[in-house]
C-alpha cells in the first residue's frame, strides 16, 4: 500500500455553478467547489501533511516567512512570550457529517513587513462522523472524509493582505475509499457576503490559486506516502522565528541602499541578501553566546568585498576583516577600528599561520613583504568568521583552536591545507551525497573535531547552494592538549603553502 504509483498532476475543474459538496449546519454559507484530483495517499497521510502546511505556510506562498501558532486547543504549550495575543477568538464553522478534531489560530508572518501586515487565521481539522460516509454492500461505512478549514480574521476582501486569496474561507477535503484504496482531494472557497455574483471577484485568479493549493497537497501527499525523509534540517542553532525577524529587520534597513550603491561587477542582489542573512544569523547567535557579557569582537578572514563586516559594524558589532586583495567596495565600506593592525576595518593581508614552518621561496616565487602578512593569531575569544574563504576554509578550526576563539565556517570551493584545489574523501556518513561540496564540509568538520571542537551544523537560510554553516563555540580540549603539527600532517601537510599564498597577489579576485 505504501508503494502506489504517483499519478501525474492533472486536476479536474468543477464547472461554474456546480452544487456545493460541503454544507454548514447553519445552512447559510455556500462553499464553491473549485477543483479536485484523484490520489493514492490515505487519510493519515493527508492529516500529516496538512498539519505541516498549517505550521509552514511558506510551502504554499513565497511571500510568507512562517506562521506563529498563537492558539491550539489540543496543545498545552505556552504561547511564545514575544507573540501578542489578539482578542479575536477562533472563527470556526460546523459542517454536516463532520466533527471538529482540532482548532488552531496561526499568525501569518510576511517576508516584507513594509508592504504587508501579519494576518491571523483560524485553521480547523475535521473528520467525518461515524455513519456519515457511503455504505458498502455489507452496510458498513466505506468512505473516510477529512477536512481542513482556513478562515482569515478579516471582515472583507479589501482588508486582506496581498499574500492571501481574496476569499472569506478555504476548505481542503480528502475523501478515501478504504475498499478500493482510491481517494480524491478537492479545494473549496467561500466568498465574502455580497461578492458571490460580483464582478470584482477574479475567477481566473481564484482558479489559479486553487490549482496551486491542490498541487501542493498532491506533491506532499504522495511524497509522504512514499516514505519521503527530509534530509536537511534548518534552524538547529538559531530558532527560525528569531532569524527571520532579524533578517526582515536588516533587509528593510539596508537592502535598497546597499544594492543601489553596489560597486562590484558581481550580482548585487545575490551578495546583499546573502550577507544580510549571514549577518542576521550571527547577530542572533551572538545574542545567545554573549548574553550579559561584552561582545569580544570579530575577525572575518578572507572577507572579500567587505560587505558582511560593514553590515555587522552598522549594527554595532566591533570587528574587522582582511583579504589577499583589496576590492572596489572597500572605498565605501572601510571604517576605523582600533583592534586591527592598521586601524582600519578592512585591510589587505595574506594569512601565513605562525604554525607553518618557514619555507625558502624558489626563484619563481614572489617574496612576500612581512607587512602584508597576518600570522593567524587573534586575541582570545575573538569570533572568527570564514565565509566562502576558500583556501582559508580548512584552516579556520585550526586557527580558532590555537587562539581559543569560537568560529563559523561556511565552506564553498574545495582546497587542502596547502591552498591547492583538491577533492576531499567522501563523507563518513554513507547516507550523505558524495559530491565535492559534501565531501569538503565533512572533511572540514573532521579537522574541527580533531582540534577539540564540538561542531554544530546549520543549514543557513541564505540564497546560496553553499549554505552549510559549521559552528564551533565549545572546545573540549585546551590548546596545549592538541598536537597541531600532527593534525596538519594527518590532513595532508602544508608543504607549498607559501608559494600558493604568493600566487594570490597576482590573481584576480573571485566573485563569490
From Swiss-Prot:
It comes from the Eukaryota. This is tRNA (uracil-O(2)-)-methyltransferase. It is an enzyme of class 2 (transferase). InterPro entries: tRNA_uracil_MeTrfase (IPR011671). One of its GO terms (cellular component) is cytoplasm. It catalyses: uridine(44) in tRNA(Ser) + S-adenosyl-L-methionine = 2'-O-methyluridine(44) in tRNA(Ser) + S-adenosyl-L-homocysteine + H(+). Belongs to the TRM44 family. It holds the Pfam family AdoMet_MTase. The gene is TRM44. Disulfide bonds: none annotated. The keyword Cytoplasm applies. GO terms for molecular function: tRNA(Ser) (uridine(44)-2'-O-)-methyltransferase activity. Its EC number is 2.1.1.211. One of its GO terms (biological process) is tRNA methylation. Keywords: Cytoplasm, Methyltransferase, S-adenosyl-L-methionine, Transferase, tRNA processing. Probable adenosyl-L-methionine (AdoMet)-dependent tRNA (uracil-O(2)-)-methyltransferase. Coiled coil: none annotated. It is found in: Cytoplasm.
Amino acid at each position: 500500500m505504501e508503494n502506489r504509483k504517483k499519478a501525474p498532476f492533472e486536476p479536474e475543474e468543477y464547472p461554474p455553478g456546480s452544487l456545493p459538496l460541503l454544507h454548514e449546519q447553519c445552512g447559510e454559507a455556500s462553499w464553491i467547489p473549485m477543483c479536485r484530483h484523484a490520489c493514492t495517499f490515505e487519510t493519515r497521510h493527508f492529516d500529516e501533511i496538512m498539519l505541516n502546511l498549517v505550521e509552514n505556510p511558506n510551502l504554499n506562498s513565497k511571500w510568507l516567512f512562517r506562521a506563529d501558532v498563537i492558539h491550539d486547543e489540543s496543545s498545552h504549550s505556552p504561547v511564545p512570550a514575544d507573540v501578542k495575543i489578539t482578542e479575536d477568538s477562533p472563527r470556526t464553522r460546523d459542517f454536516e457529517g463532520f466533527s471538529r478534531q482540532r482548532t488552531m489560530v496561526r499568525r501569518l508572518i510576511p517576508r516584507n513587513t513594509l508592504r504587508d501586515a501579519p494576518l491571523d487565521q483560524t485553521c480547523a481539522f475535521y473528520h467525518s462522523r461515524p455513519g456519515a460516509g457511503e455504505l458498502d454492500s455489507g452496510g458498513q461505512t466505506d468512505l473516510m472524509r477529512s477536512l481542513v478549514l482556513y478562515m482569515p480574521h478579516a471582515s472583507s476582501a479589501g482588508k486582506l493582505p496581498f499574500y492571501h486569496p481574496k476569499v472569506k474561507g478555504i476548505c481542503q477535503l480528502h475523501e478515501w475509499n478504504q475498499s478500493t484504496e482510491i481517494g480524491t482531494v478537492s479545494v473549496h472557497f467561500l466568498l465574502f457576503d455580497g461578492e458571490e455574483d460580483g464582478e470584482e471577484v477574479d475567477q481566473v485568479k481564484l482558479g489559479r490559486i486553487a490549482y496551486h493549493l491542490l498541487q501542493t497537497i498532491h506533491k506532499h501527499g504522495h511524497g509522504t506516502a512514499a516514505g519521503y525523509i527530509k534530509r536537511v534540517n534548518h534552524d538547529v542553532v538559531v530558532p527560525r522565528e528569531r532569524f527571520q525577524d532579524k533578517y526582515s529587520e536588516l533587509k528593510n534597513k539596508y537592502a535598497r541602499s546597499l544594492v543601489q550603491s553596489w560597486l562590484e561587477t558581481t550580482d548585487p542582489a545575490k551578495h546583499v541578501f546573502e550577507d544580510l542573512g549571514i549577518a542576521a544569523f550571527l547577530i542572533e547567535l551572538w545574542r545567545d553566546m554573549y548574553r550579559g557579557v561584552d561582545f569580544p569582537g570579530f575577525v572575518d578572514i578572507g572577507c572579500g568585498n567587505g560587505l558582511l563586516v560593514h553590515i555587522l559594524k552598522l549594527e554595532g558589532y566591533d570587528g574587522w576583516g582582511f583579504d589577499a586583495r583589496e576590492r572596489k567596495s572597500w572605498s565605501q565600506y572601510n571604517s576605523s577600528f582600533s583592534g586591527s593592525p592598521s586601524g582600519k576595518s578592512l585591510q589587505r593581508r595574506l594569512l601565513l599561520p605562525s604554525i607553518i614552518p618557514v619555507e625558502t621561496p624558489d626563484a619563481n616565487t614572489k617574496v612576500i613583504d612581512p607587512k602584508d602578512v597576518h600570522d593567524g593569531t587573534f586575541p582570545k575569544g575573538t569570533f572568527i568568521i570564514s565565509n566562502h574563504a576558500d583556501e582559508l576554509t580548512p584552516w579556520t578550526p585550526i586557527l580558532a583552536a590555537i587562539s581559543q576563539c569560537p568560529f563559523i565556517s561556511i565552506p564553498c570551493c574545495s582546497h587542502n591545507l596547502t591552498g591547492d584545489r583538491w577533492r576531499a574523501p567522501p563523507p563518513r556518513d554513507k547516507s550523505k551525497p558524495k559530491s565535492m561540496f559534501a565531501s569538503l564540509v565533512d572533511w572540514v568538520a573532521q579537522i574541527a573535531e580533531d582540534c577539540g571542537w564540538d561542531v554544530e551544523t546549520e543549514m543557513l537560510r541564505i540564497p546560496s547552494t553553499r549554505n552549510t554553516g559549521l559552528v564551533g563555540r565549545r572546545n573540549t580540549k585546551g590548546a596545549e592538549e592538541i598536537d597541531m603539527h600532527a593534525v596538519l600532517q594527518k590532513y595532508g601537510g602544508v608543504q607549498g603553502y607559501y608559494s600558493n599564498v604568493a600566487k594570490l597577489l597576482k590573481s584576480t579576485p573571485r566573485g563569490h
